[in-house]
């Protein structure tokens, strides 16, 4: 099961994005109105995808990304930033801060699902590579112990 964290201070957006994620095979969403709550959750579990709003009270999406990327194991987790502000400067700042992709509101459902699905595929491939590297490392250690 792939875990998708959704962070948005607007409840209707959480409901919409969560319903869309449920359409994807083998996915479940973890919804948070507060970036702080999402960080607390992510500190103990590593999500496969994060969907975060750009503008939120208390902590914006940019600050969330910086804090999230500082968590152990979260440097490579794909992040999709969503905002009502579609100015190029906002996009650049979002991508420069560590977001992997960007969508402007109102979000096209088909495009949202396609981007989320692509990012989840990348996340699954990354995990498989990490597992394979760990296995190879253990095999090398076993082989060198014999020598």
Where are the model-predicted features located?
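Active-site residues of response regulator receiver
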Residues: 8, 53, 83
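Two-component/phosphorelay signaling modules centered on CheY-like receiver
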Residues: 11-30
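Amphipathic alpha-helical coiled-coil "transmission" helices that mediate dimerization
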Residues: 124-146
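Alpha4 helix (beta4-alpha4-beta5 surface) of REC/receiver domains from two-component response regulators
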Residues: 19, 63, 75, 86-101
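Acidic catalytic/metal-coordinating carboxylates
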Residues: 33-34, 60-66
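A Lys-centered signature of the CheY-like receiver
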Residues: 57, 105
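C-terminal output helix
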Residues: 107-116, 120
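Active-site beta3 strand of CheY-like receiver
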Residues: 45-52
């Amino acid at each position: 099961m792939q875990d998708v964290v959704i962070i948005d201070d607007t409840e209707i957006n959480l409901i919409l994005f969560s319903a869309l994620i449920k359409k994807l095979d083998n996915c479940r969403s973890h919804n948070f109105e507060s970036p702080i709550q999402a960080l607390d959750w992510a500190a103990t579990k590593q999500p496969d995808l994060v969907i975060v709003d750009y503008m939120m009270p208390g902590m914006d999406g940019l600050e969330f990304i910086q804090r999230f990327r500082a968590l152990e194991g979260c440097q490579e987790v794909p992040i999709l930033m969503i905002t009502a502000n579609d100015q190029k400067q906002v996009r650049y700042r979002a991508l420069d801060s560590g977001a992997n992709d960007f969508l402007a509101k109102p979000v096209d459902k088909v495009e949202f699902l396609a981007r989320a699905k692509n990012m989840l595929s990348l996340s699954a491939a990354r995990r498989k590579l990490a597992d394979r590297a760990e296995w190879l490392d253990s095999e090398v250690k076993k082989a060198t112990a014999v020598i």
